[in-house]
Curated annotation (Swiss-Prot):
Role of this protein: Cleaves peptides in various proteins in a process that requires ATP hydrolysis. Has a chymotrypsin-like activity. Plays a major role in the degradation of misfolded proteins.
EC number of the protein: 3.4.21.92
Subunit text: Component of the chloroplastic Clp protease core complex.
Superkingdom to which the source organism belongs: Eukaryota
UniProt keyword terms in alphabetical order: Chloroplast, Hydrolase, Plastid, Protease, Serine protease
One MF annotation (Gene Ontology) recorded for this entry: serine-type endopeptidase activity
Family, per entry: Belongs to the peptidase S14 family.
Location in or out of the cell: Plastid, Chloroplast
Protein name per Swiss-Prot or TrEMBL: Putative ATP-dependent Clp protease proteolytic subunit
Location, primary (coarse class): plastid
Disulfide bonds: none
Miscellaneous: On the 2D-gel the determined pI of this protein is: 5.7, its MW is: 22.8 kDa.
Length: 80
């Protein structure tokens, strides 16, 4: 079931902040999950990216393009 964090994610999906050292990890994971065409795995990764921002581990702002994944907000990290 959606949580309060999920609602905040939907509100803030256009500008997600993540920790700089994690950027290459997320880029690689997004690329791999996209190749598997598994939207559930991509959605989980999106939540991980958001939670990094929610806990204040922020060095860099990445712009995120929203798209629907299984009827819920998902995202593709751009510019990596």
């Amino acid at each position: 079931a959606p949580t309060e964090a999920d609602a905040t994610w939907v509100d803030l999906y256009n500008r997600v902040m993540i920790h700089q050292p994690a950027s290459s990890y997320y880029a690689a994971e997004m690329h791999n999950e996209a190749k598997t065409d598994n939207p559930e795995e991509v959605l989980d990764l999106d939540r991980d990216v958001f939670m990094s921002a929610a806990y204040g581990i922020v060095d860099t702002v990445w712009y995120v393009q929203a798209e629907l994944v299984n009827g819920r907000g998902g995202a593709v990290v751009a510019g990596l």
